[in-house]
Amino acid sequence: MFSGIIEEFATVVAIKKDRDNIDFTLTCSFVDELSIDQSVAHNGVCLTVVAIHQPSDICPQPSYTVTAMKETLDRTNLGLLKVGDKVNIERSMLMNGRLDGHIVQGHVDETARCIAMEDANGSTYFTFEYKDDREMARKGYFTVDKGSVTVNGVSLTVCNPTKNTFQVAIIPYTMEHTNFQDIRVGTVVNLEFDILGKYIARLQQL
């Protein structure tokens, strides 16, 4: 489980396709603290560390590798990553820590596309559009005003939701410390809807 509070960027240093899977090798400041089998969220996707590498000619810093399977690649924006891209990362929560964001499972539901950006006296409003699918909405894939949503792994508060769009306000600190700084109109992002809404939607069907 995660909280949606991004620790830092990881930078993609290598991408290797292995049949239907893709191995991503990345570097960050705390590679030395990682271990094999550890769960780390990448743009909101929970992935398992499968290898840790010492500095080499390919990457002068320590690095680590995670593997994304086909279902993950089909559902998320990870398949769009290129070498040099920045990825939001967060290690799984400690059970004795504060939940500063909201409950994030690391199970991305679908992608959305940025359709508008608006300056708001120092902050920035991003508008995202996702698939208008009534069946998915019945499963809890929707947003509510002042509710929580996870965008590229970042826990955010929803503004001005419609049936398939919503806005989020990004303060300068979040812009500086996440890959929201790279989002433009047309950029594809990962969405995880609030698990509480999904459970309520499911209960209504029983």
Q: What kind of feature is each model-predicted range?
A:
Residues M1-L206:
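Conserved loop->alpha-helix
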